[in-house]
């Protein structure tokens, strides 16, 4: 189709879904993850990738949205999801057998126009059918990359048309023999890097302790790529075990940053009230 950009066809305001973290929403520049786009969230193990996605699902459901979770890792924990505010009984959950099946389900959900957000956890676990049916030790070079490339070619048009947010969670691998620059790379080839409108790099930077007990992680998110606002912004927040993103802690930190809350030593005060 051909259209004139006179405003009659195109919505100029971007629809977004909050990530459940104030800092990340601000870092994204548009107030959340953009709908009608592909988003990639990657990082090391136990850095908070799935937690951030579940927080976003909870926010989407709060606003009446319908969400789907394609659990290729077969590690979805409904009890933890419920603690983060996810309405598990309203969540579409799929645990596919092969990578092809997972991406086919994703395509069907997107094309239906009946869901607002689809999360694929994770790209690394999308195993091609040939690899599952083959023997251990067989070489399947580039199969997963080809699978992702083909799927994203098919998906992007449908995603834009139905205004669905599709989030791919990805893991990190090390490239061998890299002398300069970062040896880190994400799995599943290069296609996702190109098709993603937003790429978030999430890292655990420290532990939160109460006495001797570790009760959570200090987390840092970098916006590595952003097609809807300026990239390379950062956000730091706390993820508490069994609770998710510490909303109060983030609010106070942002208050200090923008001089709304005063900090003196270990005390915080707002309008004179400590």
Swiss-Prot record:
SMART domains: AAA. It is found in: Cytoplasm. Its main location: cytoplasm. One of its GO terms (molecular function) is ATP binding. Keywords: ATP-binding, Cytoplasm, DNA damage, DNA recombination, DNA repair, DNA-binding, Nucleotide-binding, SOS response. This is Protein RecA. Changing residue 245 to I: In strain: Vedros M1801. Belongs to the RecA family. GO terms for cellular component: cytosol. Signal peptide: none annotated. SUPFAM superfamilies: P-loop containing nucleoside triphosphate hydrolases, RecA protein, C-terminal domain. Pfam families: RecA (PF00154), RecA_C (PF21096). Changing residue 115 to I: In strain: Vedros M1801. Can catalyze the hydrolysis of ATP in the presence of single-stranded DNA, the ATP-dependent uptake of single-stranded DNA by duplex DNA, and the ATP-dependent hybridization of homologous single-stranded DNAs. It interacts with LexA causing its activation and leading to its autocatalytic cleavage. ATP binds at residues 43-50.
């Amino acid at each position: 189709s051909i259209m004139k950009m006179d405003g009659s066809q195109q919505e100029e305001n971007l629809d977004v879904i909050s990530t459940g973290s104030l800092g990340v929403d601000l870092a994204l520049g548009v107030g959340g993850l953009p709908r009608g786009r592909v988003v990639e969230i990657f990082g090391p193990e136990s850095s908070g990738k799935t937690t951030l996605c579940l927080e976003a699902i909870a926010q989407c459901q709060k606003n009446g949205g319908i969400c789907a979770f394609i659990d290729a890792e077969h590690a979805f924990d409904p009890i933890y999801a419920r603690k983060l505010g996810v309405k598990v009984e309203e969540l579409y959950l799929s645990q596919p057998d092969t990578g092809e099946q997972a991406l086919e389900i994703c395509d069907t959900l997107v094309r239906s126009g009946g869901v607002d957000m689809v999360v694929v956890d994770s790209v690394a676990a999308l195993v091609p059918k040939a690899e599952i049916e083959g023997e251990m030790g067989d070489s399947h070079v580039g199969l997963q990359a080809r699978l992702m490339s083909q799927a994203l070619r098919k998906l992007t048009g449908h995603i834009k048309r139905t205004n669905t947010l599709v989030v791919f969670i990805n893991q990190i691998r090390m490239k061998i023999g890299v002398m300069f620059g970062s040896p880190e790379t994400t799995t599943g080839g290069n296609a996702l890097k190109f098709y993603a409108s937003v790429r978030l790099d999430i890292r655990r930077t420290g532990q939160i302790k109460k006495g001797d007990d570790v009760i959570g992680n200090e987390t840092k998110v970098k916006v590595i790529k952003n097609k809807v606002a300026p990239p390379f912004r950062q956000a730091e927040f706390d993820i508490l075990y069994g609770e998710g993103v510490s909303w109060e802690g983030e609010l106070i930190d942002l208050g200090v940053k923008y001089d709304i809350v005063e900090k003196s030593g270990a005390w915080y005060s707002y309008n004179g009230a400590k």
